[in-house]
């Protein structure tokens, strides 16, 4: 919500906290069949996107999330060639995945085309790989897409979803994870944004439990900073179909030729060390 002093403030009842940005005005808004998308100009954080009032990203800090949902999983897989992104309509994750030249094809399936339309207009830097020949952008139900995905056809599934409410609700249960499990090859990996490890460990445990019911045998939750999300600390959770190790191709990561603003091989090594309070709470 905006107040009379030109601040956009989102209150988080479940964490008893709030995040605010000083704004100079609203740049755009659209009511899609699924949700309301708004774009604001801030004084210090670039453009701000909200969906149904919830802060999604800013120009200044989205790289933390997009890099950490993409590069750790792709360097953990031995040779990822076929990638599916469920959600991801702002296209920042797609851009990061396509930095990996060994990836041969990426299908992104987001239910709401208007998210991508607004991203192209107001976050063009996130969409500069949308026309890559390896990319396929679909605007459809991600749950249905994964249910119909051929068995054993995918190396990595990235679930770049909103919170588990509204359009994103169906992406956090056993049935959806079972579809991902079926679609993945024997050495395939699923990764999904998994909320704040400081305040939402119960949700992370629920996700891991549902993933386990779907057949996944090992999990790793990686925390990272994300200033625009509740608590400023976020996470992604990886689930392996086959082997249990989350070792990564450290030499390849260290020798990467593309630019990142946060992710490095050294950082990847460090983030594999789970903080004691998180480890104690995880099942």
From Swiss-Prot:
Binding annotation for S-methyl-5'-thioadenosine: 35, 110, 141-142, 167
A GO MF term: spermidine synthase activity
GO BP: any one term: spermidine biosynthetic process
Enzyme Commission number(s) of this protein: 2.5.1.16
Annotated catalytic residues: 160 (proton acceptor)
Domain of life: Bacteria
Description of how the protein assembles with itself and partners: Homodimer or homotetramer.
NCBIfam families hit by this protein: PRK00811.1, speE
HAMAP family to which the protein is assigned, alphabetical: Spermidine_synth
Entry protein name: Polyamine aminopropyltransferase
Species whose genome carries this gene: Stenotrophomonas maltophilia (strain R551-3)
Gene name for this UniProt entry: speE
